[in-house]
Amino acid sequence: MTNPDLENAKYINLATYRKNGDVVKTPVWVAVHNGTGYIFSEPNVGKVKRIRNNPKVQIAECDMRGGLLGEWANGTARLVNDQAEIDAMYPAFNRKYGVIMHITNFLAKLVGRYQRRQIIAVTLD
């Protein structure tokens, strides 16, 4: 199993596990800061609940619809609540996704979702 190129992958497919073991795959943006991949999400969605119950994940490079472009790699996810870590990782998203990230952040702030975001850190095994 090869590790996906998180620095250059526009999207990754994040596979999380339900309590019954079923896999749920979700295409997401990812940015790397200090060797850790970061994802942001709404706080009460399924992937966050599944990570809270089981931090084991798999990731693979994919297109925006989740079509695989690379091989799966095993990893561990954790929910980030440390504000200093959150503040430190956001510039990586801004560099990687540029204007689209700035627009996404502006709209999220406009509707009150920016501060509610749940940040997820993924490290490869």
Enumerate the language-model features and the residues they cover.
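Short, structured patches in soluble enzyme cores that scaffold and shape functional sites
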Residues: 16, 123-124
